[in-house]
Amino acid sequence: MEGFHEVVQTEWGKPLNTMLPIKRLHIKMARLAKGLKKWRKEKIGNTRLQLAITKEVLLQLEMAQELRPLSDQENELRKRLKARSTGLAVIEKSRMRQRSRLTYIRSGDANTKLFHMKANARRRKNYIHCLQKEGGLVFSQDEKEKVVGDYFSEHLGTSTARTLSLNWQALGYTPRNLQQLELPFTQDEVRHTVLEMPPEKALGPDGFTGAFFKACWEIIKDDLLAAINNLFQLHSQGFELMNSANIVLLPKKTDALRITDYRPISLMHSFAKNFAKLLANRLAPHLNSLVSNCQSAFIKKRSIHDNFLYVQSMVRKMHKEKMPTLFMKLDIHKAFDTVNWSYLLEVLRALGFGPRWCEWVSILFRTATSRVMLNGLLGPSFHHARGVRQGDPLSPMLFILAMDPLQRILEFATQMGALSPVPSSTARWRTSLYADDAAIFINPRKEDIDAIKVILQAFGNISGLHINLEKSSVHPIRCDEIDLDHVLTSFAGIRGSFPCRYLGLQLHTRSLRKVHVQPLIERIGQRLPGWKGKWLNRAGRLALVSSVLSAMPTYHLTVFPLAAWARKSIDKIRRSFLWKGEENANGGHCLVNWPTVTRPKDLGGLGIPDLNKFSRALRLRWLWQDWVDTSKPWAGMELPCNDLDRALFNASTRVTIGDGQKARFWHDSWLDGEAPKHLAPSLFELVRCKNRSIHLELRNNGWVAALRGQITTASQVEEFISLWIRLQDIHLTPGTPDTITWKWTANGAYSTRSAYRIQFCGSYRAFRSDLIWKAFTENKCKVFVWTMAREKILTADNLQKRGWPHQDRCALCNGPLETCLHLALLCPFTRAV
């Protein structure tokens, strides 16, 4: 906005008395915040009030025009007021869009009423009417503030003494070379961190968003760099002024009453958050080597599905092979809020983090202060004494480092004989960790249950991460002949069964039934009433269908293919909301058939994902990662891929053989880019073992010995001779691994996008739809033109096909029957316009 940068430049450049870089930055930001508030009040003011006044004056002028001609001054005033009204409406809509948090919808794709409604709904949802304490419910603001203040002062503001410590060498911890983490911060590094900041996230105590830092980088960069370099030198004077946060309480469930039913999210001061993000960016590339493979949260190239697929494969294998086992899900009490700082720093030192890095983490810890925001009002400030902030970019990484020793402790206990080994030969680990979701496989023995209780209690005393066994659960696998009442005598938790939920998905021993998938469909349908489709134009509904309704099943589709009935149910919801804005719509409301709508935009569709093709594209990643990353916990186990998935994968890849140990002789495309089973299909039918490696099949011509029966037909003889000749030129290279290349990307690596796109190979486009989507206009206009190009808008001819009331003649020119072609090009009225 005009004048903004001038105000920032003026306020930022005013002289200061202090020379301490951090205090200088704090004073400048506080002073600038006041200056911008004053400037906004003078420049913009109350937009809602101004907009209401402007509309009222315009209304009076229009009423006057009905009685008499307006004067020149009145016409000029009306012209200016209309321009002013448009500008104020844009500002108000943008402001309400930010408050509504519907950031995936553009301002032009929805009515301002929708943003108002969503903002009010969020406020009502997050408003805390009452809280429960030991004596009953409290309703007044003062009493609620006392309950909240006492709780956080006790849980975050006090630390507990450690009674035990760990022998890090016995657990296999050896210091790594992490000196590069302590290099000086460069201007490019800081600027990259600033550019990564989301522009419209919730404000911290200072009131500045990422958009401000990006827009004013040239003005503020010198002071920002000076403060960060001061922290690099471990001079933290004044940092406590900027390491503050406002804690907002978000309900975990609809009927939240206790303070524990709310999730505390810290809205940090932007400078402290920037510094934490700097450290997080440096640490992120090293996490893969620092954290065991049984843990996948917050680590690049690892996925939550890695944990689920490993556990799912283990459960199914143990059930199939009738191995009695207990699957235990652990509940860690307030994990992020209770981790002990001394323990966390011990973990960092054991891993090889240097003294400067550990001191940076200590500075972030010991200078942290917070205030709880209750219904928009801030409570008193308190100092932190333990835990890591939820909302701090560095906190998730520190937390997984703090959790990782649990896996090593359990493995050490197994080696020492305190726990008996898990019977399955494919079990790489008995533990699966994803942030604070922990799961363990245990043998159904009373001695193991007693031992695990002692180990978990000791881990809680060491780390502050106490396991709540009463809320933990045990799920037996093939334990029908075992006296579980005796085995679980000392276990006070929940005894469950399969299927059960783990990491948000159904963990099962057999195939999923309809009752297990139905909740997913219901959750998708439940999103529609809150959106009020009538306040959205079709482009806005398209954005919601593409970014929300189509994304909701993605987590499920990555592991489980949806049955046809489930896909149809979800498609019905998406189709109805797109065309009518409601959950149910009949065929007459749906202007274009669904297969056309779900094609990519450049192929004549609207770009809404086809769930069947998208699910297959997601599942191909398992086949790709099974090739390129053998360190995955599920490597070598059963994959959630069917024959069609494997056929598409083989057609989409090219294998370059080295030692022939990895590639499969018959299935992989390694022989001049083709698979031998396609070169010799008749011969392939005679093969006994179809999944052997190239190395085994070429050694002593093992592929010939693997043929069962006689080669009798002419086609079999021809294929045998052709394959024999081609194999004579193949020579393996011992010590060189086989490699695989994805055909549909420039860098040869798999991507979901390319796997989805290739499934439309052979499709044609009826018209140059790409010209529509490249046009410089609002999305609602693009969607309308796309519908008209398909000749599907509700002109008279289309109304006639549906049997709906209509006028035969064009309403604009009173000419022939109204059609899309006539309305767009042939109508004299349209051509004149």
Predicted regions and their residues:
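A helix-boundary/hinge signal
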Residues: M1-E74, R84-G87, S94-M96, S100-R106, ...
